[in-house]
């Protein structure tokens, strides 16, 4: 199978869109086998719990949220749960399939949760493939309001003051009042003929929502009125077919001071001026994962699961690691002096962020890890495809 066909599968593109990838194409690029490492850190699972039935093999960007002394997590099928942050004891559980069976989900195929969780203003915000967006009381799980958005919700909602926005698969950014669910405005974005299955969440800064688009742009939308302040292409699609012209920005723009950083599939990693969108530098990388940062370094995982450290001042590559190629790595996150990433076999890898060397690993869930690890204080929270929620620490 051609490597770009395989990458589209990893990114969540539907199988129907892959009819152009024939078995007679170039042989499938192999998955890297894990090899012995010189371990210097020895992670442990502090506690774990089960979150419903997990997400199975479905595309999902469900991630836990840690706030208010609790950990909030959900499964694809409608179970939303809160656990005590210290002990892991279950505090409450809400079943969306039961809650909305006779109204919002009556004509759909169950909850199919895929977007969230976002915890803010003593509420939880979560959505799914049905278009359902719901706000819950963080204290007891009571549903405060719900709406049906104009398309599938595949990434976390973003909350800014009294507004929550969601990016839909139909190419719109929709804004709602956080307390009532009243729709405030809709910003429509151009949708190419073929896109990756996924959307990025918006970042918020200085009165604007910064959002990546499916046609290779970053746009800033004014919170108060839903109008675009500017749009800037970070990659101009080229190629002889729809696949090679895909240029989705399926990540949350990373804002650091007066600069914004974004990366596109098939395209570029860029540094932009926050106020105007002017591109400061650009480098050739292809990714649908989130960026993270520490010090003067940006860290990214590309569409082949290669890991990079890049100087955020000028885009110069500091190191790269190809030991985990095609292991369907999660987005990276910084933990102390390390970078942590999960893989499709459920291993959480610890990488020295100054050298790129793998210095530790632990298998958390053999069904695989699928979402970016969450780091709070000295703990790492990960969720596996089976529904296992685990807290990993270094002794």
Curated annotation (Swiss-Prot):
<comment type="function">
    <text>Part of the outer membrane protein assembly complex, which is involved in assembly and insertion of beta-barrel proteins into the outer membrane.</text>
</comment>
<dbReference type="InterPro" id="IPR017687">
    <property type="entry name" value="BamB"/>
</dbReference>
<comment type="similarity">
    <text>Belongs to the BamB family.</text>
</comment>
<feature type="lipid moiety-binding region" description="N-palmitoyl cysteine">
    <location>
        <position position="21"/>
    </location>
</feature>
<dbReference type="GO" id="GO:0051205">
    <property type="term" value="P:protein insertion into membrane"/>
</dbReference>
<dbReference type="GO" id="GO:0009279">
    <property type="term" value="C:cell outer membrane"/>
</dbReference>
<dbReference type="InterPro" id="IPR002372">
    <property type="entry name" value="PQQ_rpt_dom"/>
</dbReference>
<feature type="lipid moiety-binding region" description="S-diacylglycerol cysteine">
    <location>
        <position position="21"/>
    </location>
</feature>
<keyword id="KW-0998">Cell outer membrane</keyword>
<protein>
    <recommendedName>
        <fullName>Outer membrane protein assembly factor BamB</fullName>
    </recommendedName>
</protein>
<comment type="subunit">
    <text>Part of the Bam complex.</text>
</comment>
<keyword id="KW-0564">Palmitate</keyword>
<dbReference type="GO" id="GO:0043165">
    <property type="term" value="P:Gram-negative-bacterium-type cell outer membrane assembly"/>
</dbReference>
<dbReference type="Pfam" id="PF13360">
    <property type="entry name" value="PQQ_2"/>
</dbReference>
<dbReference type="InterPro" id="IPR011047">
    <property type="entry name" value="Quinoprotein_ADH-like_sf"/>
</dbReference>
<feature type="signal peptide">
    <location>
        <begin position="1"/>
        <end position="20"/>
    </location>
</feature>
<keyword id="KW-0732">Signal</keyword>
<dbReference type="InterPro" id="IPR015943">
    <property type="entry name" value="WD40/YVTN_repeat-like_dom_sf"/>
</dbReference>
<keyword id="KW-0449">Lipoprotein</keyword>
<dbReference type="InterPro" id="IPR018391">
    <property type="entry name" value="PQQ_b-propeller_rpt"/>
</dbReference>
<keyword id="KW-0472">Membrane</keyword>
């Amino acid at each position: 199978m051609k490597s770009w066909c395989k990458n589209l599968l990893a990114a969540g593109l539907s199988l129907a869109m892959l009819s152009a990838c024939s078995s007679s194409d170039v042989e499938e690029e192999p998955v890297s086998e894990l090899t012995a490492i010189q371990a210097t850190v020895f992670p442990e699972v502090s506690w774990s719990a089960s979150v419903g039935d997990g997400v199975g093999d479905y595309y999902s960007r469900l991630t836990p949220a840690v706030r208010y002394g609790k950990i909030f997590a959900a499964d694809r099928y409608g179970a939303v749960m809160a656990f005590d942050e210290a002990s892991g004891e279950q505090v409450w559980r809400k079943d969306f399939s039961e809650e909305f069976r006779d109204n919002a989900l009556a004509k759909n195929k169950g909850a199919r949760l895929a977007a969230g969780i976002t915890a803010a203003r003593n509420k939880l915000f979560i959505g799914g493939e049905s278009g359902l967006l719901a706000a819950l009381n963080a204290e007891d799980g009571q549903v405060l309001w719900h709406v049906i958005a104009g398309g599938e919700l595949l990434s976390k909602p973003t909350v800014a003051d009294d507004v929550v926005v969601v990016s839909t698969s139909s190419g719109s950014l929709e804004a709602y009042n956080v307390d009532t669910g009243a729709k405030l405005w809709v910003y429509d974005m151009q949708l190419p003929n073929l896109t990756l299955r996924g959307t990025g969440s918006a970042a918020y800064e200085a009165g604007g929502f910064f959002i990546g688009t499916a046609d290779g742009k970053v746009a800033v939308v004014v919170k108060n009125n839903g109008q675009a302040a500017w749009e800037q292409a970070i990659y101009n699609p080229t190629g002889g077919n729809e696949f090679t012209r895909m240029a989705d920005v399926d990540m949350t723009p990373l804002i650091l001071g007066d600069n914004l950083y974004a990366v596109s599939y098939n395209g570029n990693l860029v540094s932009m001026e926050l106020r105007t969108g002017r591109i400061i530098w650009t480098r050739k990388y292809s990714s649908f994962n989130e960026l993270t940062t520490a010090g003067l370094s940006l860290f990214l995982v590309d569409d082949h699961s290669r890991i990079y450290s890049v100087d955020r001042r000028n885009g110069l590559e500091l190191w790269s690691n190809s030991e985990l190629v095609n292991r369907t790595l999660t987005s990276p996150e910084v933990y102390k002096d390390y970078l942590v990433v999960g893989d499709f076999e459920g291993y959480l890898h610890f990488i020295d962020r100054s050298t790129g060397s793998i210095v530790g690993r632990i298998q958390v869930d053999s069904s695989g890890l699928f979402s970016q690890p969450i780091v709070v204080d000295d703990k790492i929270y990960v969720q596996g495809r089976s529904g296992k929620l685990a807290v990993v620490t270094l002794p």
